[in-house]
Amino acid sequence: MLVLSGGTGTPKLLQGLKEVADFWVVVNTAEDVWVSGNKICPDIDSVIYAIAEVIDDEKWWGIKGDTFHTHERLKELGFDEGMRIGDLDRATHILRSEMLRAGKSLCEATKAVAEAYGVKQEIFPMCEEEVSTTVVTDEGEMHFQEFWVLRRGEPEVKDVYFRGIEKARIPDEVKERLRKEKEVLIGPSNPITSILPILSVEDFRERLRDKKVIAISPIVGEKAVSGPAGKLMRAKGYEVSARGVADVYADFLDLLVVDEADKGVMERSVATNTIMKTKEDAVRLAEFVVKLFDGL
């Protein structure tokens, strides 16, 4: 099974899915950013940390028990990184960045990082090229990290686009596996900033039309479970609801998993408890989805 993932929602699910199914992951890289000379791939790192079970499961980013000595020391020296980067997390960024500077691809660097953390599943970036999710606000354009991390999602959003997406290509390693894959699960990540960038790489969306595709809605009622998904969906003209999520994936989606609160809101949907507060919740949801694929 192929799983499409961003940095929130889906990593929780993957902790459960690894107990019940074999899978590989293609991860959004449109939120990647260079900080202090190192390439940060927040969504890839969250996926790896979650599967390795070292993720800070209170914030759902970074590493559990991390310290921030380097970040704080830089601040004392008069340099503000903008993002609060943990010391252990920074080691991941350094490993990746040194490999990239040595001429390795992002796919190769991601494989090395995953293996270093003991992750057996294959994790791939959506592309090798630099793509940046850009949020058009009432205060001007800003990188998604600036909008969400520095500004806490406060500015009014007018539009969202992916700078550089026209040059992005599906990695050969992903093309080969995708050609053979029959089942695709779109995790409960932000449809606009986590999943849409992946679907916008070359002809990725078209390649899903002959697959069995199930998506899990990150919207319950009219609210996002976490993050700014609602605000961003409205900006792109989608209804903030499970139906709006289905509309984003309309041309290839076979079935949408919605929360029990949204039971019966639309055809081609099935309801269960989609809120994952514990690993047991994640295992239960993963088992539910795996059985759905068997019935498609």
From Swiss-Prot:
GO molecular function: LPPG:FO 2-phospho-L-lactate transferase activity; magnesium ion binding
Top EC class of this enzyme: transferase
EC number: 2.7.8.28
Binding site for 7,8-didemethyl-8-hydroxy-5-deazariboflavin: 45, 84
Highest rank taxon of the organism: Archaea
GO biological process, any: F420-0 metabolic process
Record Gene3D superfamilies: CofD-like domain (1.10.8.240), CofD-like domains (3.40.50.10680)
Cofactor: Mg(2+)
Keywords from the named record: Magnesium, Transferase
Signal sequence range: none
Record field: catalytic activity: (2S)-lactyl-2-diphospho-5'-guanosine + 7,8-didemethyl-8-hydroxy-5-deazariboflavin = oxidized coenzyme F420-0 + GMP + H(+)
The UniProt record lists the keyword Repeat: no
InterPro entries in UniProt: CofD (IPR002882), CofD-like_dom_sf (IPR038136), FbiA/CofD (IPR010115)
Pfam hit, one: CofD
Pathway linked to the protein: Cofactor biosynthesis; coenzyme F420 biosynthesis
Transmembrane segments: none
Family that this chain belongs to: Belongs to the CofD family.
NCBIfam families named in the record: F420_cofD
Subunit structure: Homodimer.
HAMAP family linked to this entry: CofD
Biological role stated in the UniProt entry: Catalyzes the transfer of the 2-phospholactate moiety from (2S)-lactyl-2-diphospho-5'-guanosine to 7,8-didemethyl-8-hydroxy-5-deazariboflavin (FO) with the formation of oxidized coenzyme F420-0 and GMP.
Protein name listed in UniProt: 2-phospho-L-lactate transferase
Organism: Archaeoglobus fulgidus (strain ATCC 49558 / DSM 4304 / JCM 9628 / NBRC 100126 / VC-16)
